[in-house]
Amino acid sequence: LMIIEDDVRRTRRLGWIAVGISTAITSFWAFWGIIENFHEGWYSESLWANLGMLLLQYLAPMLIFMGLALVSIIWPRAGGVTHGLLALLAVWFFRAFSVTATFLIVLPLLGLGVLHYLGRPQPRRTAIVVVLGVPLLTLVIAGIGPALRVSQRVDNGSFGMRYVEGNGVALYWAPAGPGWPVVGGDWFAAQEACHFLREDGLTLAAVQPRIWRLPTVEEAVRSMARHGQNSGGEWDEESASAIYDRTPDKEPPLWNVHSPVIYWWTATEIDDGQAYIIVYDGKVWPRSKELGPDNLGFRCVKEIEAPN
């Protein structure tokens, strides 16, 4: 009888360890997903497109791990086997037992599968509430602030050439087109596009007029704004960091609210292989000049006297 009771306690303990780990992993992906959704996603003019991106892209890891945990609580053996199959799928996906994939994905999935296979958390209803409730609570708490910020963005729908003056900088910013594209590219392509841009900023010339250029990192930092007001940014070259009176956002006159681009190249080089990029919220990071994802774009600038 004592052996049976010990076995029951052991299976309960293993079950709750599995529930705790699954809940922690699911909560992490809930936090990451909702933060990233409102940082780089939620840019479409269609609510349904935004919701679809939220569920299928940013919350997919959370939903997968939550589903795995629920299956494992209700059908422990099936859940344990499913974890093992996913570990094998991860091995196939990464094509080899790389150190990163092994320690961060494969081994955790296998270990969690064994715990769920052997464990029996009781009461089961409480385990289900924990697996569902904690990640969803994390999602809501982490998402309130970013959701409010995005909902309060100002959008005047103007994508023409803009003259922006303030905080010691006065520049014309290129209109939508080759000098302000909707998708990104590498630093070299951005430099070339600016150099070939004609006076009106709408077309490229056959020979480089060199009227336009990329903004320096200091110019970009000093030009950042929120709700139509300059953010009072200053660039500290010694620490390679930007400081603002108020956090900038993805808004006019510089940014397109409905564009997937959230980073811009600057003209400021770190060395032959790296240059600074600026995020719409004002952060500045070094990046390889050969990097060219769709969300890393640019906007050319030119120096001309302010219109009368």
Q: What does each model-identified segment do?
A:
Residues P61-L70, F103-H116:
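Hydrophobic cores of alpha-helical transmembrane segments in multi-pass inner/ER membrane proteins
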Residues P123-V150:
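Internal/C-terminal transmembrane anchor helices
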